Amino acid sequence: MQLTELIETTVTGLGYELVDLERTGRGMLCVYIDQPAGISLEDCEKVTRQLQHVLTVENIDYERLEVSSPGLDRPLKKLADFERFAGSEVSVTLKKPLDGRKTYRGILHAPNGETIGLEFERKKGEAAMLDFTLADIDKARLIPQVDFRSRK
């Protein structure tokens, strides 16, 4: 069983979604998890304990394990991610330029089959639609929406 498959099976078995997995050259294993209600410190501890056990049993070599939430600027990797975050502001970088540019920022539209839509501003006030597939994407991330105004 490959490392990604092993970790995904463990994480989903605990009721979480594996968002991303990174392995650094220094032996650090970074696991990013999520669930609709968000991730707490207790969730990270629970997954860490289980993964440490599984990685030891499977004799997987690593120096350090880090489990965390994907953060406010969560990466979008699966079609289900694009479905879940439809209506959100995102940044998408394509593998190949389209209309002379690779990076687009706009409002995500729900996928239609394999096609994902992004409404962006081409020029001041001129809205345009970009259609692409997962295969076209180099990287895609949510753009954090933070409100610093005080609540009354």
UniProtKB/Swiss-Prot annotation:
This protein's record includes keyword Cytoplasm: yes
InterPro entries: Ribosome_maturation_RimP, RimP_C, RimP_C_sf, RimP_N, RimP_N_sf
Record key words, sorted: Cytoplasm, Ribosome biogenesis
Coiled-coil segments on the chain, per record: none
Membrane-spanning segments: none
Protein name (database record): Ribosome maturation factor RimP
CDD domains found in the cross-reference section: YlxS_C (cd01734)
Localization (cell): Cytoplasm
GO cellular component annotations of the record: cytosol
Keyword Cytoplasm: yes
Task performed by this protein: Required for maturation of 30S ribosomal subunits.
GO terms under biological process: ribosomal small subunit assembly; translation
Membership in a protein family: Belongs to the RimP family.
Gene designation: rimP
